[in-house]
Amino acid sequence: MTAAQKRIWGWYFFDWASQPYNTLLLTFIFGPYVVSVIGDGSAAQAIWGYGIGTAGLIIAVLSPLLGAVADKSGGRMVFIWLFSALYVLGAWMLWYSAPSDFNVWFVMLFFCIGLIGMEFATTFTNAMLPDLCPRADLGRISGNGWAFGYLGGIVALIIMLLLLAEGTSGRTLLGIAPIFGLNPEAREGTRSVGPLVAIWYALFMIPFFLWVKEPRKTDALPIGQALRAAWPELKLTLARLPQQRSLFAYLASSMFYRDALNGMYVFGGIYAAGVLGWSVTNVGIFGIIAALTGAVFAWLGGKMDSQVGPKPVIILNVVVLTLVAIAVVFVSRDSVFGVPVGPDSILPDVGFYILGALIGAGGGSLQSSSRTMMVRQAEPERMTEAFGLYALAGKATSFIAPLSIGVVTDLTGSQQLGVTPLIVLFLIGLFLLLWVKPDGEPA
């Protein structure tokens, strides 16, 4: 491979390395495990929502400032190393969540430390995208990265289900006891998801750190000076955002639809475990289906993005995901879309698997095109700051989905009604796209 190709593949490997935090911890393995330990689906959904919402507020406050500092200092890699360490620490410590000594606040603390590490590392690697290829190839490269990341999540999930995660019988999907002598009665197979995610990230970030070289910035400032210079400029950037109508509208739109999508990811496994009574294995299969469709449609969406631009791709996927959010409310163990079913019926399971496939397809393509749309809206010399604002947009209201789900679930005592805020968030995001120019404001 040429140096340029290695750089692109190294960048892809960040998606491959980091995706298991979303796939295994946030959605399909560790989230449902917390539900099973707490024993009350509604209470677990509410606690999970409060924890994720708090982490989102921290990310929202710091992302733009750190992005501006990185642009001034030319030091994205330093931040990626730092937040990678938080990722690994947070994931590893989830091993200490045994059912016999389960401290929900300890678990949420380290889960959120890892989540913060992942989100900040993502901000800095996303900002490298425009340096990798010509503008015409942005959609394809972004889509390929998302697809490669989803494949990484699938492989990690398959390893988890086949070799480690014990089902209700105490055996894995292969019908064997968890490997390495892990004790299924203490849920050690399932708890090993934390160390697995930590080791996976550390191993597969090696190509990234070896092959992705940051261009030398001739006017780079020391970190201290960069911090002092970045804050006034960031305030100026925020003050003039309303005058940059297209960028402002896009940040606001993505703020809502990405929050809704993240709500689907975070609560999908918890919802299935609580409403349908699925085991960790069932939720894992659901995750494989969603990740497979996510990989395929991130790749297809990237091709479509390169041909017609990111805006039509974003609109299409937000519409699809809105319809899915509506459909989820009407799937339970007792009925499917209003039609009563017997207690042994497989229709609720089949229906939710189909919805999971649609969530994966829409989510993969939507996230890929959202990344390229941000590149089109941003000023090239302020790219990391722009992706910091993008992270701010994703997190400034990121507490709305989890906290509103937590509140509505608490008030109604129903996990089904608890997910209805996602519908409203998708529709707000769709409406705000009306003011977004496909290629951003003219220079």
Task: Kindly label every feature range from the protein language model.
Residues 70-86, 306-321:
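Cytoplasmic membrane-interface "Motif A"-like loop-to-helix N-cap segments
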Residues 1-8, 213-251:
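Juxtamembrane intracellular "pre-TM" segments in multi-pass secondary transporters
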Residues 48-68, 157, 288-300:
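Central cavity-lining transmembrane alpha-helices of secondary-active solute carriers
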Residues 81-101, 320-345:
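C-terminal ends and interior cores of transmembrane alpha-helices
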Residues 8, 203-211, 331, 419-443:
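Multi-pass alpha-helical transporter architecture, strongest
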